[in-house]
Amino acid sequence: MIVRNLTEARDSNRRIVSPDGNWESTRMLLKDDKMGFSFHITTIYKGADFRMHYQNHLESVYCVRGRGEVETLADGKKYPIEPGTLYILDKHDEHMLRAFEEMEMACVFNPPLNGTEVHNAEGAYELNAEAL
């Protein structure tokens, strides 16, 4: 059994802050845990407006707190995000994420992240990032 505490994880190297200042993510479960997926609690800062395109991963995102929107770039559709909303990037969807308020999100990635990933120039995470 694995048991971790979010407050303790935030005070460790499991807390990753994006270089562009849009988000921070506490990586609670990672590839080395051998569960087949990773689980993160991610804070998207108010005013963040950025493009992502996870070419190497599938992701599901559940909004715990805050409000914003996600836009699929293929068709320009915008979907409101509020507490209780789940969006699923099941087709490696290129998208924009906008935070009208600070948002706290619970994120699941498959394949699992190693831990140190930040978005590359295409808005994706690399598969060969350093493990925590």
UniProtKB/Swiss-Prot annotation:
Annotated GO biological process: ectoine biosynthetic process
Organism: Teredinibacter turnerae (strain ATCC 39867 / T7901)
CDD domains: cupin_EctC
Pfam families from the UniProt entry: Ectoine_synth
Name of the protein: L-ectoine synthase
UniProt family annotation: Belongs to the ectoine synthase family.
Molecular function in Gene Ontology: ectoine synthase activity
Superkingdom assignment: Bacteria
Gene3D superfamilies: Jelly Rolls (2.60.120.10)
